[in-house]
């Protein structure tokens, strides 16, 4: 899974999911976009638990909650969540991404480390 969320693939895969969701549109489109947001969120939750990367403290729960809201919008009857569509989910994804990496930048500037916690407390393979 990791190659799909890092590097060039980490840009192309979300773009593909969001583009597919936008092409389909409506409830199905937001469900498609929410699949990627859920994958990214759950990956970041696991990564934070394992490696303690600072941005994952924000992106993990943020994206997971955004995906839950996306699936709720796709499944909810009526128009209560009709405002939450692919364009909104994409903006939420980018804002959470910026907040996570912004926090990581601040932590790294202050501590010299991208990971939270004491030096050496995270896994060797991170």
Residue spans of the language-model regions?
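Membrane-helix boundary connector in multi-pass membrane proteins
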Residues: 69-91
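C-terminal ends of transmembrane helices
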Residues: 42-53, 104-109
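Structural signature of hydrophobic alpha-helical transmembrane segments
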Residues: 26-38, 86-94
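Cytoplasmic-side transmembrane-helix entry/capping segments in multi-pass membrane proteins
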Residues: 54-65
């Amino acid at each position: 899974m990791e190659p799909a969320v890092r590097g060039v693939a980490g840009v192309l895969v979300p773009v593909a999911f969001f583009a597919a969701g936008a092409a389909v549109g409506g409830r199905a489109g937001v469900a498609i976009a929410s699949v990627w947001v859920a994958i990214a969120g759950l990956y970041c939750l696991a990564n934070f638990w394992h490696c303690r990367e600072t941005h994952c403290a924000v992106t993990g729960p943020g994206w997971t909650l955004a995906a839950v809201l996306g699936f709720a919008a796709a499944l909810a009857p009526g128009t209560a969540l009709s405002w939450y569509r692919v364009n909104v989910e994409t903006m939420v994804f980018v804002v959470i991404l910026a907040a996570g990496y912004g926090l990581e930048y601040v932590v790294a500037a202050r501590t010299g480390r991208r990971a939270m916690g004491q030096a050496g407390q995270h896994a060797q393979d991170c």
